[in-house]
Amino acid sequence: MKHIRNFSIIAHIDHGKSTLSDRLIQVCGGLSDREMDAQVLDSMDLERERGITIKAQSVTLEYKAKNGETYQLNFIDTPGHVDFSYEVSRSLAACEGALLVVDAGQGVEAQTLANCYTALDMNLDVVPILNKIDLPQADPERVAAEIEDIVGIDAMNAVRCSAKTGVGIDEVLEVIVEQIPPPEGDPEAPLQALIIDSWFDSYLGVVSLVRIKNGVLKKGDKFKVMSTGQNHTADRVGIFTPKQTDKTELKTGEVGFVIAGIKEIHGAPVGDTLTLAKHGAEKPLPGFKKVKPQVYAGVFPISTDEYENFRDALNKLSLNDASLFFEPESSSALGFGFRIGYLGLLHMEIIQERLEREYDLDLITTAPTVVYEVLLTSGETVYVDNPADLPAINNIEEMREPIVEANILVPKEYLGNVITLCIEKRGTQVNMVYHGNQVAVTYHLPMAEVVMDFFDRLKSTSRGYASLEYNFIRFDPADMVRLDILINGDRVDALAMIIHRSNIRHRGLALVEKMKELIPRQMFDIAIQAAVGSQIIARSTVKALRKDVTAKCYGGDVSRKKKLLNKQKEGKKRMKQVGNVEVPQEAFLAVLKLNE
């Protein structure tokens, strides 16, 4: 056991985590040169295309250290994006140490800090590593000082390496062996294994990634899942080297996979504990805190017969992505679908893309909303995440919107732009600290403003240098109203949105204009209105198509033309009473794009 090292790699987006993992795998000979390709752990197509890590992946390597001993290194590559921070905290729970990778050109960023604090809270040893020293703009001295100043860990003797060129990789491995403590645990005690991750394989059933805290799990053992109390037999156990490699047993302190032919999807929930069916452990390990979704959106299959497939797909995906929340929802405009809760907009985009790609579905999403706390006149408090469920205005005593605390790190030359943006988003400044060239600003912002397009705007006003990390703190009273869109006097539930009263004129006008472009002309006039309660605040009309009925009249009396025109008018009037308007898919998507 004293030769096992479990560690994670944490860093901000694009500081080189995945490339560093590639080098470690190569140096330790986990894969032959033929099988090696760039970012070998980012196995999802989506991860490769966007160049980001979404799922944490684990690898076990053998490393022969300079002192002649052979060590088993289990490491987990984690995502750097703020929406996936729960993936990071899960990975950290399985480790004794973490490598904090910092780009020697960019320096410390908000996400580096957030993940590093998570690691320190879990009492892990954090080892700083300066990456990308081959770049011309690299300045390791300044960055090391920055790490000490902002993060507060000793970084003067931090290893300097370049994952791309392979310089300093051996030193990184030595540091891992020297500075990260071996796992603690009792091989004789009853088995306790923490499920770090699980995914569904159509041939093998549920595959779970586990970290053995105490005891040993052998192939063929009968084990039980502590939260459900169900018993299963371990058909295969093993490790990833990154290839799936079978072993006869997983010992204390190791990280590996278990396949038990569990067919029902929630058979082994993430964060659960496995123990042996006979002589099992008394109590489960402390799991992870359940992540609360921050953003909700209705998602509907374009053709209704795909509803069942959509439900299966969501079930399979939620096994792999523990933070996904969904419940059935129906809409008069879009039929049956699900209300899905996400951690943020990137998460929402990724989930939708994964559903469309991996499960071949055609989906349409309504505008995302956050959860509001509503105090009713009857004195009870309800939580609303769907604009259609908002009680009538006269029943509402007070609306409260969620407020987040946003920590922004920005170079001082862009500070002005960032402050302007935060004020425009109804933020209040709480704190500002200068660290050398960087400024750390803390703002309290309404979550609704943050989830919409705050991140993109922040990046564009600061040329990509500002970085953001936020978490929910409380609900604050706010003057929020529901904006409805009426088409020919009928409310379209899928287009409703909850916004701040100061934005309704501007938003309502923009919306009806956009809808006017997108709804095709019919044989009769279509009135598109934006309303708050019974008050109409904006309107536009899609003009009717009409046949030129007077074309056959040459000369003659004007009453002849009038007769024909009036006859046409009567017909249009009758048509309007019975006519239905089809709202095209693009119109729903336009609502999402409005803020661009």
Curated annotation (Swiss-Prot):
Which residues does the annotation say bind GTP? D14, H15, G16, K17, S18, T19, N131, K132, I133, D134
Q: Which Pfam families match?
A: EFG_C (PF00679), GTP_EFTU (PF00009), GTP_EFTU_D2 (PF03144), LepA_C (PF06421)
Query: What's the protein's topology in the membrane?
Result: Peripheral membrane protein
Which superkingdom? Bacteria
Q: Which family does it belong to?
A: Belongs to the TRAFAC class translation factor GTPase superfamily. Classic translation factor GTPase family. LepA subfamily.
Entry keyword annotation includes rRNA processing:
no
InterPro entries (UniProt xref): EF-4, EFG_III/V, EFG_V-like, EFTu-like_2, G_TR_CS, LepA_C_sf, LepA_CTD, LepA_IV
Q: What's the protein called, per UniProt? A: Elongation factor 4
Gene name, Swiss-Prot/TrEMBL: lepA
UniProt xrefs under PROSITE patterns: G_TR_1, G_TR_2
E.C. numbers: 3.6.5.n1
List the Gene Ontology MF annotations in alphabetical order: GTP binding; GTPase activity; guanosine tetraphosphate binding; ribosome binding; translation elongation factor activity
Its main localization is: membrane
Task: Cite the tr-type G domain residue spans from the record.
Answer: 2-184
Cysteine disulfide partners in this protein: none
Q: Which reaction does it catalyse?
A: GTP + H2O = GDP + phosphate + H(+)
Q: What is the stated purpose of this protein?
A: Required for accurate and efficient protein synthesis under certain stress conditions. May act as a fidelity factor of the translation reaction, by catalyzing a one-codon backward translocation of tRNAs on improperly translocated ribosomes. Back-translocation proceeds from a post-translocation (POST) complex to a pre-translocation (PRE) complex, thus giving elongation factor G a second chance to translocate the tRNAs correctly. Binds to ribosomes in a GTP-dependent manner.
